[in-house]
Amino acid sequence: MVKPCWRIGAGMERSKINPTKVDGLTWYKDLGLHTFGEFSMAMIQANSVMEDQCQIESGPLTFNNPTVQGTFVGVYDGHGGPEASRFIADNIFPKLKKFASEGREISEQVISKAFAETDKDFLKTVTKQWPTNPQMASVGSCCLAGVICNGLVYIANTGDSRAVLGRSERGGVRAVQLSVEHNANLESARQELWSLHPNDPTILVMKHRLWRVKGVIQVTRSIGDAYLKRAEFNREPLLPKFRLPEHFTKPILSADPSVTITRLSPQDEFIILASDGLWEHLSNQEAVDIVHNSPRQGIARRLLKAALKEAAKKREMRYSDLTEIHPGVRRHFHDDITVIVVYLNPHPVKTNSWASPLSIRGGYPMHSTS
């Protein structure tokens, strides 16, 4: 019998009125309230152990300036194990608040420093665990973070998760991608790597009809993946499939996020932040159309279901049959998927009517069979 167990993270909201819930392999919160509107979030497990994590933090964004209020949203798509994505969920928001407190504001530099410090500390953890758990060097995570504050939305990304804005236009809605992705199958990412490593003919290798960095990984930026950042981990007892045949002198992968800043307008309805498991099956426009044309309650779960229906269709099977497949085997049909939909009020909430601080973590399942 499948027993997914979802552990609630520290500080996680446990409202009796509108709690987070679990239904089989799906974790969700159908509707909640953040500083500037409503939100919906959902996750579904495909791997034998859930590698995705997510969070939403709403309220003060600094420790010392109560006027800096906003909403932080994070989607962390782990690979090689759940350790890196869990580490990000534990650490990146406190680091963002720390650096924002130093400057008494949110900025691109503050967010980038939070990414860098999180990666640095995770690599320290890998170093400490190397003697007893060397495979931690092969664990990493994409990191997508959004911050809504002072009429601006900051989107920072390492890896291939995606943030898409739904903007009202001529009676409908138009998809506006806010994030920049780092995947070797994108021409821009390949050009970047070739320019950074001009003397390395194997920096990118085509394998099974997909481009991979050094033939092993598709993402070109990430948190973790120490074996591609520090040569000291490119040796035994790391598994042979992760060891590179040649020595390297500078990091192959970067943790530097691409950051975009968008000033919100009354036409901006919502933002969808999701791991690439969603975008493998839904286009940007398909996703925003679903959100625009559907009730808010449970919208994140509705997006999950739409993606799973497409995954089943591609494999010429029924959706109901797909839902019966156990984790691990299920990964052959779709990835772990995380979706957060953040609705935007046209006019920011006034200072004296801010919602209570909110902290919700999604993830931490420990799947087992018995």
UniProtKB/Swiss-Prot annotation:
Q: According to the UniProt entry, what is the EC number of this protein?
A: 3.1.3.16
Query: Which reaction does this enzyme catalyse, per its entry?
Result: O-phospho-L-seryl-[protein] + H2O = L-seryl-[protein] + phosphate; O-phospho-L-threonyl-[protein] + H2O = L-threonyl-[protein] + phosphate
State its cofactor: Mg(2+); Mn(2+)
Q: What happens when the gene is disrupted?
A: Reduced apical hook maintenance in etiolated seedlings. The pp2c-d1 pp2c-d2 double mutant displays a long hypocotyl phenotype and strongly reduced apical hook maintenance in etiolated seedlings.
Residues binding Mn(2+) 2: D77, D276, D335
Where it mainly occurs, coarsely classed, is membrane
| Pfam assignment, any one | PP2C
Q: How does it assemble?
A: Interacts with SAUR19. Interacts with AHA2 at the plasma membrane.
For this chain, the family text in UniProt reads: Belongs to the PP2C family.
Q: What is this protein called?
A: Probable protein phosphatase 2C 67
Q: Which gene encodes it?
A: PP2C67
